[in-house]
Amino acid sequence: MSGISAQLVKKLRDLTDAGMMDCKKALVEVAGDLQKAIDFLREKGLSKAAKKADRIAAEGVVALEVAPDFKSAMMVEINSETDFVAKNEGFKELVKKTLETIKAHNIHTPEELLKSQLDNKPFEEYLHSQIAVIGENILVRKIAHLKALSSHIVNGYAHSNARVGVLIGIKYNNEKNAPKVVELARNIAMHAAAMKPQVLDCKDFSLDFVKKETLALIAEIEKDNEEAKRLGKPLKNIPTFGSRIELSDEVLAHQKKAFENELKEQGKPEKIWDKIVPGKMERFIADNTLIDQRLTLLGQFYVMDDKKTIAQVVADCSKEWDDDLKITEYVRFELGEGIEKKAENFAEEVALQMK
């Protein structure tokens, strides 16, 4: 064990939570190379931190920080195994240091974070030490780091339960409107936190996704109509399309012509068609963009005014403030979204802990 200091053994123990003698043996085997010693312990199944890192982390927090000038914002999802751990002071300090590191090194991905430096050592090393100390697997799963260009602002909203966070970026032209744009961005972020839009705009959808969702939507409406018919209630229109991306100029022109032919067959004077057709087209578009209304931020109806979509709210503010506003960024994190958490019985859990 010549040349292996007590300080190095302690450092390896802190990083892996392995036994003291196992740490000494590992360091001797690899001639004092700390990283190789960590790998050695993992390969031998002696690193408790490594075992913890194999367990599923689906709890934790979503945290964000917006710069005082609203020119930058950061958001992070950090997962733990239980919500209890997410509330302890050690975990809160980890979240704080993570945000500080993201800001200091202009980090945009978890991979960049792990390779960055914190207090003159790799962040990954710091994270492993916290896994050992806190006693649960901890994973920095998602990072968003937005920076505003000139005539842009970013703002955000984090729900009080620390499970949902949203960042919104808005472009504007008139600097005097900046305070109002900041408030608008926060209100829209609050809307998105509650309503869960998947994307900013229908242009972010693939055509295959829209076609698949439209088939499911039609089946859903047909089922609802069966119940409505049984109860003697009005039936919903069955859409042909699901999203604005399917409504090409040709599709709209064809539908407009169909409405005009319908009015002609009904004997309506041609001079009044211009008063009837726009309303019919508006209803046609509404009936055939239901996916947008459900899943896009711009297409959803605003929670603070459910007669207007977010796109209409932004357009109205542009007109009222003599500006040209545009939402340019939308990021939403929800804790554990997409993680499949294992259901284990008590006996299995105890057996795992004994390994």
Swiss-Prot record:
Q: Which GO terms describe its cellular component?
A: cytoplasm
Q: What SUPFAM superfamilies does the record tag this protein with?
A: Elongation factor Ts (EF-Ts), dimerisation domain, UBA-like
Q: Which Pfam families match?
A: EF_TS
| Gene3D superfamilies the UniProt entry points to | 1.10.286.20, DNA helicase RuvA subunit, C-terminal domain, Elongation factor Ts, dimerisation domain
Subcellular locations according to the entry: Cytoplasm
Entries under InterPro entries matching the protein = EF-Ts_dimer_sf (IPR036402), Transl_elong_EFTs/EF1B (IPR001816), Transl_elong_EFTs/EF1B_dimer (IPR014039), Transl_elong_Ts_CS (IPR018101), UBA-like_sf (IPR009060)
Coiled-coil annotated residue ranges, if any: none
Instruction: Extract the ranges annotated as region (Involved in Mg(2+) ion dislocation from EF-Tu).
Output: 82-85
What keywords are annotated for this sequence in UniProt?
Cytoplasm, Elongation factor, Protein biosynthesis
Which GO molecular function terms does the record list? translation elongation factor activity
* PROSITE patterns noted in UniProt: EF_TS_1 (PS01126), EF_TS_2 (PS01127)
Q: What does this protein do?
A: Associates with the EF-Tu.GDP complex and induces the exchange of GDP to GTP. It remains bound to the aminoacyl-tRNA.EF-Tu.GTP complex up to the GTP hydrolysis stage on the ribosome.
> Would you identify the family this protein belongs to, as annotated?
Belongs to the EF-Ts family.
Write the protein's name.
Elongation factor Ts
Q: What is the lineage of its organism?
A: Bacteria, Pseudomonadati, Campylobacterota, Epsilonproteobacteria, Campylobacterales
